Swiss-Prot record:
Organism: Gloeobacter violaceus (strain ATCC 29082 / PCC 7421)
Cited function: Synthesizes alpha-1,4-glucan chains using ADP-glucose.
EC numbers: 2.4.1.21
Sequence positions that bind ADP-alpha-D-glucose: K15
UniProt family annotation: Belongs to the glycosyltransferase 1 family. Bacterial/plant glycogen synthase subfamily.
Catalytic activity: [(1->4)-alpha-D-glucosyl](n) + ADP-alpha-D-glucose = [(1->4)-alpha-D-glucosyl](n+1) + ADP + H(+)
A biological process term (GO) from this entry: glycogen biosynthetic process
Full protein name: Glycogen synthase
Gene (name only): glgA
Higher taxonomy: Bacteria, Bacillati, Cyanobacteriota, Cyanophyceae, Gloeobacterales
An MF annotation (GO) of this entry: alpha-1,4-glucan glucosyltransferase (ADP-glucose donor) activity
NCBIfam families membership: glgA, PRK00654.1-3
Length: 458
């Protein structure tokens, strides 16, 4: 099977959100199964040092613009990577420009021209989020089946009021909204977790597209993301003070003590150390913490370390809390990979109280590293974290359902109480670390989906 991934992001080259992790990892798992998988990505200015072909492998026109496509390799692999070159992409960041609608329409049109004119002949074109939502529309005349993956329905892209000036399709095809176009015209739609696939069909999570999505029937399925378990491995992670695995979990406490020293906390194995690694945005549910600081800090012995950046309101929320409780709360308002890995490898509890979470990667890394997750029961969090039951030794974390500060506080207390029982907590950690969080299962589900679509080509 020949599959082309088209996306705006791809880890480790160009990453803002979780889509990049999918586009940078799922092709590797599919290639291990024998599929011929390639990726096409805008040639951003910050990719200038990436080794690539000296000359374009394809040159053509799109939207009255001259475009070039270079070929490279996904770092650390043999996966071919096509880079769409045009001055519109020669920036030092991916988003935050007024012409984003035009830029990603140009990218999508270039991909379409590349395929129309024989640049490559995939059997399946796998499109990701609104940036590539127009591609299924343009592929209708091609012997190519299209899959459209919704990573986050809240981001539907800017409207395209000038669409008809550049392409020869009727305006009533949903093309004014690239997310809608992808949903309507693709051969199959996937969401990044089974629970999220169900949630987006409801008014609460459907972002005004729930009616459209309910009407898709079996075309919409949820396939849970995985993580790169080779790259994310506490046994080899160079950022940790001490490496460990399930057979040497007792060594993990050294990472906790080192983290406490790093942030000026009381150094004690008996203090519950809570970690947060996240974008600080409304989706992540941190507004639930605002009413809790005084109550939680005065009635608990927990320590909290936060790593992330984003909305100024949430940065202020954590900065002010750290100033109020300097011995108990620390906030690093940036993103730093070594610190993130030290939090995963040293925190006892990992907090994700998300308002909604299409899939989530933080809770899976936490499970992999033995940091017990405390999450809200939504989206991919509900598909990966299961409530601990001390009676039957099942479950791997703590969940609360109702989006309410009191519910979150009650679960924090419950987790701290469970932490007192060290043998039980260790078994909780082991259940998380032993789970298969790799891309293997996801890759098999996607391969089956591709196969079923190709069979329809005849």
């Amino acid at each position: 099977m020949k599959v082309l991934f088209a996306a705006a992001e791809c880890a480790p080259l160009a990453k803002v959100g979780g889509m990049a992790d999918v586009v940078g990892s799922l092709p590797l798992a599919l290639a291990e199964m024998g599929l011929d998988v390639r990726i096409i990505l805008p040639y951003y200015g910050f990719l200038g040092e990436l080794p690539k072909s000296e000359q374009p492998v394809w040159t053509g026109g799109a939207m009255f613009q001259q475009v070039e496509i270079y070929e490279a390799r996904l770092p650390g692999s043999d996966i071919p990577l096509y880079l769409v070159g045009h001055p519109a992409f020669a920036n030092e960041r991916i988003y935050g420009f007024e012409d984003e609608a035009w830029r990603f329409t140009l990218f999508s049109r270039t991909v379409a021209e590349f395929l129309w004119r024989g640049g490559w002949d995939p059997q399946v074109l796998h499109c990701h989020d609104w940036h590539t939502g127009l591609l299924p529309l343009w592929m209708r005349s091609m012997p190519v089946m299209t899959v459209f993956t919704i990573h986050n329905l809240a981001y539907q892209g800017p409207p395209l009021p000038y669409f008809r000036a550049f392409v020869d399709v009727p305006y009533d095809t949903g093309a004014w909204n690239p997310m809608v176009a992808g949903i309507i015209h693709s051969d199959a739609i996937t969401a990044v977790s089974p629970t999220y696939a169900r949630e987006i069909c409801t008014p609460e999570y459907g972002e005004r597209l729930d009616g459209l999505l309910r009407g898709q029937g079996n075309r919409l399925t949820g396939i849970l993301n995985g993580i790169n378990t080779k790259a994310l491995d506490p046994a080899t992670d160079k950022h940790l003070t001490v490496n460990y695995d399930t057979t040497s979990l007792d060594r993990r406490v050294e990472n906790k003590l080192a983290l406490q020293r790093e942030f000026g906390f009381e150094v004690s194995a008996d203090r519950l150390l809570v970690g947060i690694v996240s974008r600080l945005v409304d989706q992540k549910g941190f507004d639930l913490l605002a009413p809790l600081w005084d109550n939680w800090m005065h009635t608990s012995g927990a320590q909290l370390v936060v790593l992330g950046s984003g909305d100024p309101f949430y940065e202020f929320l954590f900065r002010s809390a750290a100033e109020r409780y300097p011995d108990r709360i620390k906030a690093v308002l940036s993103y730093n990979v070594p610190i993130a890995q030290r939090i995963y490898g040293g925190a006892d509890l990992f907090l994700m109280p998300s308002r909604f979470e299409p899939c989530g990667i933080g809770q899976m890394i936490a499970l992999r590293y033995g940091a017990v997750p405390l999450v809200r029961k939504t989206g991919g969090l509900a598909d990966t974290v299961f409530f601990h039951n001390p009676l039957d030794e099942k479950g791997n974390g703590f969940l609360f359902d109702r989006y309410d500060p009191a519910n979150l506080l009650a679960m924090l207390y419950r987790a701290e109480e469970a932490f007192r029982y060290k043998d039980y907590w260790r078994r909780l950690q082991l259940r998380g670390m032993e789970a298969d969080l790799s891309w293997r299962a996801s890759a098999h589900q996607y391969a089956d989906l591709y196969k079923s679509l190709i069979a329809r080509l005849g």
